[in-house]
């Protein structure tokens, strides 16, 4: 009986160690970014970007900006990149209201075969509303991004009003 109790306790200790290590790994693992694929629709692209920017530093610092970069059209990346420069641009006066905003709405304005335009309204953390035009295009060149919807343009923000 003593051997049974002894091995039972060893088993419990072993399971506790495995559980502890699993929790530590999950807590420290960097979240994988959603990669563009041809099954993600234009509206979803904009929502993925906005949800990520809404919680920019979760689970890691600048994760939202990095997620947004993933869905930037290669031509847009050439104009706004590399990634470190893109991060500075988003954190600058023109787009800082997107970071850690409180709420957003996305409304379809125009949809064509290869280009879709949305009006995005964002409520920033100071409770001011801003409006953007957000355009996505279907990538037509061969390669891993073929037929993926990617952001080609986000307008400068137009301040609307305070929510208070």
Feature-to-residue mapping (PLM):
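N-terminal Sec-pathway targeting helices
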Residues: 2-14
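Boundary at the C-terminal end of the N-terminal hydrophobic targeting segment
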Residues: 29-31
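Short solvent-exposed beta->alpha transition segments
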Residues: 59-113
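Exposed beta-sheet edge and beta->alpha loop/turn motif
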Residues: 108-164
């Amino acid at each position: 009986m003593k051997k049974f109790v002894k091995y039972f306790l060893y088993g419990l200790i072993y399971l506790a160690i495995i559980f502890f290590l699993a929790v530590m790994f999950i807590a420290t693992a960097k979240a994988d970014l959603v990669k563009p694929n041809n099954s993600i629709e234009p509206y979803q692209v904009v929502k993925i970007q906005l949800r990520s920017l809404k919680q920019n530093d979760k689970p890691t610092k600048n994760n939202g900006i990095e997620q947004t970069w993933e869905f930037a059209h290669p031509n847009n990346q050439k104009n706004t990149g590399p990634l470190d420069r893109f991060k500075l641009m988003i954190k600058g006066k023109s787009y800082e209201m997107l970071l850690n905003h409180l709420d957003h709405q996305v409304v379809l304005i125009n949809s064509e075969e290869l280009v879709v335009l949305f009006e995005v309204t964002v409520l920033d953390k100071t409770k001011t509303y801003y409006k953007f035009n957000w355009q996505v295009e279907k990538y037509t060149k061969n390669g891993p991004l073929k037929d993926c919807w990617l952001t080609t343009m986000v307008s400068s923000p137009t301040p609307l009003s305070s929510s208070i």
